[in-house]
Structures are given as structure tokens and as C-alpha cells.
Amino acid sequence: SGESGAGKTESTKLLLQHIMNLCKGNSQLEQQILQVNPLLEAFGNAQTVMNDNSSRFGKYIQLHFQKNIVRGAKLSEYLLEKSRVVQQDTGERNFHIFYYMFAGLSLEEKQMYGLLDPSLYRYISGRFGTQDVAQRWKHKYQEVCNALDMVGFQEQEQVDMQAILAGVLSLGNVTFEPEESHGSVKVSEASRGWLKAAAVNMDVLSQLVFCVPCSPWSPSVSCCCSLCADARDSIAKVAYGRVFGWIVCKINELLAENVDPEVELREIGILDIFGFENFAVNRFEQLCINLANEQLQHFFNHHIFQLEQAAYKEEELPWETITFNNNEPILNLLLAKPLGLLSLLDEQSAFPQATDKMFVDKLNSSFKGNLHFQPGRGRVLGFSIIHYAGKVQYTAGGFLEKNRDTLPANVRGLFINSITPLLSFSLQDIAHRALTVLWLAGLLIFLCPRQHSLMVLMERMYSANPHFVRCIKPNSQKEPGVVDSQVVLLQLRYNGLLETIRIRRDGFSWRPSFEEFAER
């Protein structure tokens, strides 16, 4: 764990290499476990203002052992930041793979996928990079292709995957305009070429446009144009999310153990998940990320402080209780039922007429006087949470839509019959998952799938015997060889590391078994 850019992903890779070396790992499986990283980073990482190679998803790697030999592995992914596909803030980029494609595809391949100059695409903000950067991306693209071959993607599957990615970029340039004769909406004349490049049938998209429901409270044509644009972005996010999920499934097929089910396997799990984030603009995604960090910090506190000191008291050892920064009040603010922030968000998300402003008003009235909540100031629609790592101001625009995380039923139905098997399968799978989650809603802390997956992750963590690796970010400027003492000290404080050092120094850090003690 650690802040964004502290080195969690790099440490995870080093830890995997270390474990494989301890196993004297030279088998094909052990090498494959190490070689899937370029693929995951290309599709799941992006440049942010805090980190040039920031993981925009969390991953839990389970290594299965028989004696000292790795027999298999499984990868679980959490909270992929799909909204990055359609929007990035200043100084940030889309997922790496889009830039790698532009740098690595030949001219003939770009023509086949309908790709033009990268400066033309809205989803990558018309930004590319210098010649040196493009050359580095070209090399990365080749690494991705090699990894796809190694994982077992067939040639046609790779073509389908890149066609979807290219189609996503082209779809982002499709715009809508009023249809004067019918008082409805149509695809703008200027963007019909992008529609063709996205390989979307005009009649199909027309159905999409005409059956997107306009709000009865503001049934203007401009409102319908906006809703059509939202539906377009939803398609792009779902398509990309499914490509990523497909890659994870193929990796798991490759790494699955091939042993007798009755053979007992031991397990080491490595969790590499987002660090605490505080950007100039913080949205729903940052709230989910910071909630995950709050839960992991509570998990750390529970094992290091509460269980440790409880053991001393149980054995009646002389001990002066060490206080620590307990973040339970923050978790209660976010997770309490029925009046926690996320419960109120789920409640508002259930009403089609609810707005982000109504949600913020509800928060302001419910949490008035709460020490960890502050209403937004001025005209900004938002609020602030005083997290264990510091104060974060959230912009509330889009909270309800992102929490619903749904694709309009009409859009889903139209694309189930897509000519690309992957996309067709993806939307059928999404429809099935949505129904399952809704059926389980009464039993879950959260409504939407992304938060449900976080709950499952925490259940796994509490059933394990944990070891904590704290990654410390040396400076905030992404500079090599520079240590900012104040930045480091702040992290040591809010992570609880100073208290951890004290409890280890003053307590009983060596716990030998009786047999080990007798041998000494």
C-alpha cells in the first residue's frame, strides 16, 4: 500500500520475481506469471498528474503452491476506472494501449482499423507525444503483442480486440444534432465519417438515438442530444471494460493449475491496489479509491494495533496502551446503514428524477456537524471528506450516473447482435451480471458491482494471515533521487508507521515457537 506513485506495482513485480527465485522458478508457468505484467499495464495503467504509470485498477494475485513449486495462479481485478476511456483531466492521459497502437501499428494496419492522426480523437484529447516518446511506445506495443501471443490469443481475436479499441476512439467523435423536421435528434452530418470508422450501422445508431428516453422534466432536444452523448460514452466504457475483463479471463485460463483437485495447495496472495488520491478535481472514482484505502488502513490498524495489544492484555504483560489514528468514524460516515454516504447515494440513484444537487443537499443535511464531512463552498457542487490521509474535496457532478453504472436497455439490446463476437458476448454477460447484482442488492453494502467486488476483496483479506509492505513516495514532483523529508514524514504519520515502530520497539516483536526457543 501507499500513495499513488509510491511504487506499489513495481514492488509487486519485484516481490513476484523474488518468490519465483526462491522456488528456483524456471518452469514455463513461473515465467508466464512474470510475463503477463506488460499486458496488464498496457490496458490497465495510465498517466496521471501523480504518476506516469498509474494503475487504474486493483489486482489480487493468488499463487498456488504444492510444496515449493508453483502449480498455478489466479488474477482478480477490481474497480477498473472505465470513465478514463471517455474523459481525462488536464495533464492526464487515456489508457496506455491507445497510444501504443498509434505508435506501433503499420500504416496498412491503421487503414484497416480506420485510424487517422491521433490529434483528431476526442477520447485522447488530441494529445500524443514527442518522437522519442512515440518510439518508446512503439517498443511497448511490440511487448504487448508478444504478451498476447504468449497468453494464447488467436490472431483473429487480436484483430477483433484492436478493432474494438479503434472503434471506441472513432465512436467518441460521433456527435448529435437536432432533426428540425421531426423535432428529434440525429447523428450530425460532420461526424458520419466517424460513425463509419467505428463500424456502427447507421440504422442501428438511429434506433439508439430515437429510443434514448428524454427526461420528462426537461424534454428539450438539447437534453436528448446530451442523453445520446451519454449513451455513446456508456457504450465506449462498457466495450473497453469487457476487453480488459476478457484479457484477465484469458490470463487465468493460461495460469490455472493442472493438478488433482484432491491435492492440497497452499496460497500466497499479493494485493496491489490504488493508492490514496487527491487531485485538483476528485470525482466518484477517487471516492471509491479512497474508500478502498480507508478499509485497508482499518485492516492494518486491526492487525497491528488492536490484535497486538489485545494479545499483551490476554497474557497479562505489563503494557501501556498505544493510541493510534482510528479511522472507524470515517468508515461509518461512508458505509453506515441506512444513513451513510454510500447508502444515501444508493437511495438517490434508485430515483430516475434525482439529481446530483439533490444528493449533495441530502448529504449536507444528514452530516451537518460531522467532524469528517464539510459542505462544498461557493457555487461548486460538491463536498469534502476528512480522510485518514487528509482532506479531499469531491466534485459531485456525475455521482448518480456513475453509481448506477448501467447501460440503457435499448442500447444493450442493439449491440448484443454485434458482428464482433467479443462485443456481443460482453453485453450479454453484462446483462446477466446486472440482474444478479440487483437480486442480491438487499444483502450487499452497495448496489453497484464495483463496490460489491470491494466487499468480496475485504472478506478475502480478513481470512488471510497478512504481511504489510508500505511503499513511501519520496517526493511529489516525480523526480528521481530526490527525498522530500516533509512529504515522507507526512506519509509515515498518516499510515500509522510511526506508531508501528513504537509498538515493535516497546513490545514483543520476536514470537518464537516453543520448539524454536528450546533449540536455541
Question: What residue ranges belong to the model's regions?
Answer:
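P-loop (Walker A) phosphate-binding loop of NTP-binding proteins
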Residues: 3
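Extended, low-complexity interaction tracts enriched in P/G/S/Q
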Residues: 6, 17-88, 96-103, 199-206, ...
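Hydrophobic positions on the alpha1 helix immediately C-terminal to the Walker A/P-loop
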Residues: 11
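Active-site signature of alpha/beta-hydrolase-fold catalytic machinery across serine-
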Residues: 14
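Helical/strand "switch-coupling" subdomains that flank nucleotide/phosphate-binding cores, especially
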Residues: 70, 87-209
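Short basic/glycine-enriched coil/helix segment immediately N-terminal to the Walker B
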Residues: 160, 262-266
